[in-house]
UniProtKB/Swiss-Prot annotation:
Residues annotated as domain Longin: 6-119
GO molecular function: SNAP receptor activity
SUPFAM superfamilies: SNARE fusion complex, SNARE-like
Intrachain disulfide bonds: none
Subcellular localization: Endoplasmic reticulum membrane; Endoplasmic reticulum-Golgi intermediate compartment membrane; Golgi apparatus, cis-Golgi network membrane; Golgi apparatus, trans-Golgi network membrane
Subunit-level organization: Component of 2 distinct SNARE complexes.
Gene3D superfamilies for the chain: 1.20.5.110, Longin domain (3.30.450.50)
Species for this entry: Danio rerio
Protein family according to the UniProt entry: Belongs to the synaptobrevin family.
Taxonomic path: Eukaryota, Metazoa, Chordata, Craniata, Vertebrata
Single GO BP term: protein transport
The protein's name in its UniProt record: Vesicle-trafficking protein SEC22b-B
Superkingdom of the organism of origin: Eukaryota
Amino acid sequence: MVLLTMIARLADGLPLAASMQEDEQMGRDLQQYQSQAKQLFRKLNEQSPNRCTLEAGSMSFHYVIEKGVCYLVLCEAGFPKKLAFAYLEDLQAEFHEQHGKKVPTVSRPYSFIEFDTYIQKTKKSYIDSRARRNLSNINTELQDVQRIMVANIEEVLQRGEALSALDSKASNLSSLSKKYRSDAKYLNTRSTYAKLAAGGVFFIMLIVYIRFWWL
């Protein structure tokens, strides 16, 4: 189930729109998660992964960053990740169409709170049983959900390590892997040249031997 949806400006973490589960008891339970979401918005930056899943006990945060805006949803841990990211991409497309040009100019929190109407409408369509049955038909061409980075929300917030740092570590590992492959290729090339050179020297010595000793 989709329990909380928030949209914020990436540059400063300013909340732009939000929609929370309407049930009052559930709403009180979600205050902690809403606070975590706001902390997360303040940590994100342009170097952060543009798609990420953050585990939070029995819940999971999923977010998408596009065109300077972060779209975040809180779901029960068992809610399909593919469905969650398809939902966020749907919101992203509509929000950018309606408010994209105004995002850099606003200064008040929740300046686009009226977008809640579209959020509620979209949320219902994604939690509908028919939508869940048709999960395999949802268009997720822009991303492979199996390769989206997964982290723990408490570790990220308590450790004080920006998600960009986690992304940098992944990039460093990738760079080291590429360097290893490059070095291995270079060494293999040198080995091949050395073998050819040794063969050439042997051939020349054989010719010299035949010429001076047999001719």
